From Swiss-Prot:
Active site, per annotation: D93, D276
Coiled coil regions in record: none
Record PTM Phosphoserine, positions in chain: S129
Protein name as catalogued: Pepsin A
UniProt keyword terms in alphabetical order: Aspartyl protease, Digestion, Disulfide bond, Hydrolase, Phosphoprotein, Protease, Secreted, Signal, Zymogen
EC number: 3.4.23.1
Organism listed in the record: Suncus murinus
Amino acid sequence: MKKLLLLLGLVALSECLYKVPLVKKKSLRQNLIENGLLKDFLAKHNVNPASKYFPTEAATELADQPLVNYMDMEYFGTIGIGTPPQEFTVIFDTGSSNLWVPSVYCSSPACSNHNRFNPQKSSTFQSTSQTLSIAYGTGSMTGVLGYDTVQVAGIADTNQIFGLSQTEPGSFLYYSPFDGILGLAYPNIASSGATPVFDNMWNQGLVSQDLFSVYLSSNDQSGSVVIFGGIDSSYYTGNLNWVPLSSEGYWQITVDSITMNGQAIACSGSCQAIVDTGTSLLSGPNNAIANIQKSIGASQNANGQMVVSCSSIQSLPDIVFTINGIQYPLPASAYILQNQQDCTSGFQGMDIPTPSGELWILGDVFIRQYFAVFDRGNNRVGLAPVA
């Protein structure tokens, strides 16, 4: 009888999936547009997605998270920090590795408009003397590091290091729909040697598998989810195709080719790509993206966005990413984003340091089409068409 109970317990653990619901909200860009601030923002800040992966600040600082690159994010989840837990809305970001939230020590307008962590109201908080700096645009966010219990989908992640911001210059953050960032990349790109949240979960035996997975819903305000410690096959069709990482740090893989109408439009002879839930669009080298924008008839509007005629979506071709020998087509309905105002291209150019070659960022535009599994135990990414 005892053996049976033990077996049942092990089965229950193996099937336990910890799910964080993600809510779709207006992006920071949309909020800036509605408040008439986008033009001023773009004049003051160079929005270059590559700065997230090639920071110019010292490696010891938390400079791998320039905040301007989150301005198009729409998917957010809730976590709790402290005892009792204080609630925060965060971006679950596979393109960075640190956790940070605003603190009560920050009195700038951007902080006062968001949830702020109060260490004095947590019985489990431990302070440190370590500082952090988060670079973005023309200024930086500064703060300190501390330890506390982080609640994620019912998991109590104890003794978790995280950042508490003390200054947040820049009025644009006032309009951001999120409080902070929860990074899900590898520990070797974390600032100050901090252990990322998922690594801490695994090290403490809080999840049964050394992986997590992401489903992003295309249409609904709800339905999107991050799953810790397992895979839910109801979110995808067919089989998962596994892609080995070409580099461990970011979730970086090799793309064989990118084609349209059977012709190569970029990435001839293979290229590198990062699968990043913390990037909303699909980013690539400026020249390649310019060719794609021209091919789909996109032109720039007053808000700096590339727009196409909504009536042309049905006639636009698929753009096909071939990865590890498998084709992943993106239909126009995926790479053209329809909102109340217009139809915008889901592609974005970026400046990349020359030694890095051709790099692409497979953001939410791609992940909405393909359920993604981030397998730390085997250093690979699994992809399958969403159900």
